[in-house]
Amino acid sequence: ESGQLGSFTKCYWGHPAYKLPSELNLLATAHYLEALGMQAKASRIAAVLGGKMPMHMSSVPGGTTYTPTMDGLQAILYMVREINEWVDRVYLPDVLAVAPYYLEMAHQGRSVGNMLAWGVFEEASRKPEERLLPRGMILDGKLEVLQPDEAQVTEQVTHSWFDGEGALHPYEETTQPRYTGYSPDEKYTWVKAPRYNGKRMEVGPLPRVIMAYLAGNQQAKKMVDSTLQALGVPGQVDLLFSALGRIAARVIETKMIADAMERWTLEIMGNIQAGNTALYVPHEIPDSAQGVGLWEAPRGALGHWNVIRNKK
């Protein structure tokens, strides 16, 4: 009835940003639709483990409420291998095919040069700086990994609709709403502005991959170096601090996680076969305490600061 022939019609045809040849456009569009199926498959894995996706329900302090079975893990392993094969066959080649048409994006969306990753996916050492995607930060664009101190984290409310001014550590701040109307020069948002020692920090896939690369993760080094080589800019890691670099980082991170998922599934299956079926270590809630959990969400660094008083 609308006259629109499909979901991708009536776009900005003729715009100079449309650089791909028609064959590559068709291929990328077909693969985009395939990607929706792969995304659903990944969500299905998370739902099996966590009851639903997103916001899974099986993680509790001390372990998990999910009881894995060999049948369930075999099904997960099959889906993991399907996803990993698709990443190798479609996702990686597509990005390398499209990227040469947009090399100018390596000079657009440049980062401020400050990057932070709390790290995610524990390895055997249980050290945050040795996670699959390790903890670390870089400052002022210098390719040197520093270890962040959570005590340096603050949240500013100068331009937020909350009581208070300036920046405070999460343990010290309050969240008392105070709506004063919209003013671009004063207060204009319900969002607080996190800072590290007063600095703005970029978080997300690019910082995570950069930390893995600089920490010496062999897979990250191989993939970053080969990507730069394929783009004709070997060794120029600083070009990743850009719009193009963020796209490349998403691909590299996806491949690292896809490989690790197969390894993790096999490890759990091995534990069950060896009789190691412990799921949960009970913990007594103290009368008073405070603590912080530092992790990663897909969008970037995530911190939860908690204070317990009277067991609450």
Where are these regions (language model features)?
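Active-site and channel-lining beta-strand-loop segments
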Residues: 292-312
